[in-house]
């Protein structure tokens, strides 16, 4: 049922994205392309389909998840990191910690789905690697000279300059996405 809901109501094939907020009849109520949610959903749906184990869902969902990954790669990934979102046609070019984490996993997943040795698979592998390099250099908090880094900054600009006015941890900021990314990378690589 959830896969059908994603495919039939949440995924927008015309815009190659998910819609994120709805009225009670499943009509989208805002024009928002959330790049992080699209790349996160792509790999989570693929994992869910794998667990369900029904070929019909794999056949239905794989084109959708590959379309989501392809679209964010083309419109939001600049070769080293993922922009946050596009709200009514205006792109927020800041880099939010969780979007960067989900980008690594999402592109690794897309590479596997396409075949890691294919041209498209190689494109996604290079993108995941570039994203990880951006994270290591700019998103991980290296203040106080701690070489391995600490928690991740909440937000950096597209050039990697951190916004230090945001807390490192708060109710909406914890190591969930970055911790899960590390576990997924260990499992996939």
What are the residue ranges of the model-derived segments?
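Glycan-recognition and catalytic cores of secretory/periplasmic carbohydrate-active enzymes
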Residues: 1-189
């Amino acid at each position: 049922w959830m896969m059908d809901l994603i495919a039939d109501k949440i995924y927008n094939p015309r815009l190659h994205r998910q819609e994120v907020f709805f009225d009670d009849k499943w009509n989208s109520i805002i024009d928002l392309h959330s790049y992080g949610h699209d790349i996160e959903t792509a790999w989570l749906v693929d994992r869910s389909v794998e667990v369900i184990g029904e070929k019909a869902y794999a056949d239905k969902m794989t084109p959708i998840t590959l379309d989501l990954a392809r679209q964010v790669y083309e419109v939001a990934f600049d070769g080293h990191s993922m922009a946050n979102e596009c709200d009514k046609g205006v792109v927020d070019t800041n880099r939010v910690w969780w979007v960067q984490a989900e980008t690594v996993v999402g592109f690794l997943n897309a590479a596997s789905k396409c075949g890691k040795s294919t041209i498209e698979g190689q494109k996604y592998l290079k993108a995941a690697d570039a994203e990880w390099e951006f994270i290591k250099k700019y998103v991980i908090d290296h203040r106080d000279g701690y070489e391995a880094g600490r928690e991740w900054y909440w937000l950096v600009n597209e050039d990697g300059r951190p916004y230090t006015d945001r807390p490192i941890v708060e109710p909406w900021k914890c190591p969930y996405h970055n911790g899960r990314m590390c576990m997924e990378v260990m499992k996939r690589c």
